[in-house]
Amino acid sequence: MEFTARHNITTVLTQNLVAAGDNAGSINSVHLANVHASDDVNVDLIVNNSGADYYIIKNVTIPNGTSLVVDTSEMAINTSSNQDSLRIKLSAAIPVDVIINNRK
């Protein structure tokens, strides 16, 4: 797959932000913005490796109209083939915009 740095997430289903094999390089940070007018949302940001989940953040509330920047620069997230996927899960179908800052 091809790496995509920007995502609009609107579902409670776990979504891949970066899939294993995307070769996204070093992921320095993940910017999460709750763009809903009135509702808060809880967010999980997950590294998945070979079916095992490792939480970067779990059940963190992002109030409506605010953002959270997660620094991942010190984490060894390897998105080459058969390695790590970066995933997101929302507590409700509240729209969250995601921007991934990476360096190849």
Q: Can you say where each PLM-predicted feature lies in the sequence?
A:
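Ser/Thr- (and often Asn-) enriched beta-sheet segments in non-cytosolic proteins
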Residues: T14, N42-D44, N59-T61, V69, ...
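Generic preference for flexible, low-structure residues
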Residues: V43-N48, V70, N78, N102-K104
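Glycine-rich nucleotide phosphate-binding loop and flanking beta-alpha elements
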Residues: S38, A76, I94
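Short, surface-exposed beta-strand/strand-loop-strand elements in extracellular ectodomains
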Residues: A37-K58
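Intrinsically disordered, low-complexity Pro/Gly/Ser/Thr-rich segments with frequent PxxP/GP/PP motifs
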Residues: G51-D84
